[in-house]
A protein has these predicted regions:
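Short secondary-structure junctions
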Residues: 29-38, 70-78
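Short, charged/polar, Gly/Pro-enriched secondary-structure boundary elements
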Residues: 56-59, 93-94
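Short intrinsically disordered terminal tails
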Residues: 1-13, 92-94
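A generic structural signal for short, non-catalytic loop/turn and secondary-structure boundary residues
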Residues: 42, 68, 80-82
Length: 94
């Protein structure tokens, strides 16, 4: 494994741990906790975190997650079905 890949792997693990611990504190209504979740590395430089089947999410909740992930993170919320949305966060790995 290259040094860059090892650093990225460590950073991804740190982001996943920080997100799990942070959501436990800021998501009392379980809007994101327990939802289908996927991670995808984009070009080895960014980590996309996607939550599916989210019943709805307030801007304040998105801002809370962004505080956990870091200020360089950005988010999109898109309709998935009439009753749910998909929430994506993208975090730089560098």
């Amino acid at each position: 494994m290259s040094e860059r890949a090892a650093v990225s792997s460590e950073r991804i693990t740190a982001i996943q741990q920080r997100l799990a611990e942070g959501l436990a504190k800021i998501d009392p209504h379980h809007r994101l906790l327990g939802r289908p979740l996927s991670y995808r590395v984009i070009d080895g430089r960014m980590l996309e975190i996607t939550y599916r089947d989210v019943a709805g999410i307030a801007e304040a909740e998105v801002l809370g997650v962004k505080r956990i992930l870091g200020r360089d993170c950005y988010c999109t919320v898109a309709p998935q079905t009439a009753e749910s949305v998909t929430v994506r966060f993208v975090v730089p790995l560098e």
